[in-house]
């Protein structure tokens, strides 16, 4: 545990950062540049030639070819609201976002906050009255910024998926004071889905569709979002969505939460979501930032500190929803730009395999963003940084104790069996919340099967 003085300092620093969270202002289109209005539901996204939005056509083509050649199955570049080029051989089909789901989830949370259902500084005890003081005092903000301080390991979180991650979260002991330490946790995010349901009276997915996706023109059959064993929407990585619809979400973020004449998400929330914390200057509300001079990564048993921005050589106001193997929804306000990159890596950094959890560890993605942003002709490019010469810090495993924290067998078994200090007595792998596992599995298969059937039936709609 950190000292009381350190905790107070961290709290004050975080409060100062969030109180003065800047709201990014998208770059204004140069005189004579094309601008494209927001598409209506069912409409194709408007296009423009690169030169019409002050981008070098040859450089755009070269960047797109590079991205596709580096494993991208959907690479799209938008400027001033216009699609200026893409390489999307898979067509406009729903693609798995992995952890980029977290960023989309943060937009849904932002909509609920904007509508006044709860606030980011509300404590969990407001929604879970049975929580003990340790868990009750954790705030929504600390969940969004991955700084709850609760015990985290991958085996424990995987075990939680087979039981109930909300109950698991409320049973986990604290390793750190809330707000002081960044950990790239997974199951703790499930409490956000439950909070939306408790406060709005709607299923999380129904709320997301009604209040956010429908206003953006995203049809229900355009996405699939799986649930965990207990029926909670998997906010940590369970969404598959069409690249074009991800571009709509990216544009919403670029426009500080406005769409047409509606303020779907408060600009203040967007500003806080894209501002780092004392625990991790490179991470906002489930969103990765290029603004920090340093950032902490996804390593276990403790997140490693990097002494550089996440994307050296790219604009510092860049922020991104990021998922394993290189799923990106990236916004660059200073270039009035949205970039979509979905696919797989053709290069693996063996020195930092955990970096694959966000795709940022792959130098090809760093190179791609530099090429795309440097193609803008009305704003000087950032100084080039060769990503292939960058070295990553060593993994934080220095002995058997660290290895034990990574493997964490006692915690995982405790959760699966429903016994011990890490587990909820109401849930184990065979019986959870009054239901046997076959009932839960059948229900989940019906749910995701219905979504997949709907998505397959809609593949012929909204041709690009």
Question: Where does each model-flagged region fall?
Answer:
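Secretory targeting and sorting signals
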Residues: 1-31
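Structured C-terminal helix/loop/strand segments within mature extracytoplasmic catalytic/sensor domains
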Residues: 32, 318-464
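A short, well-structured edge-of-sheet supersecondary motif
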Residues: 59-91, 329-331, 336-340
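Short, charged, amphipathic alpha-helices and their helix-cap/turn boundaries
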Residues: 77, 82-83, 153-178, 202-223
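Active-site SXXK
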Residues: 81, 94-121, 143, 192-196, ...
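Active-site helix/loop module of the DD-peptidase/beta-lactamase fold
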Residues: 114-148, 202-236
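Active-site-proximal alpha-helical segments within enzyme catalytic domains
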Residues: 188-195, 237-259, 282, 327-344
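Active-site Gly/Thr loop motif
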Residues: 220, 276-338
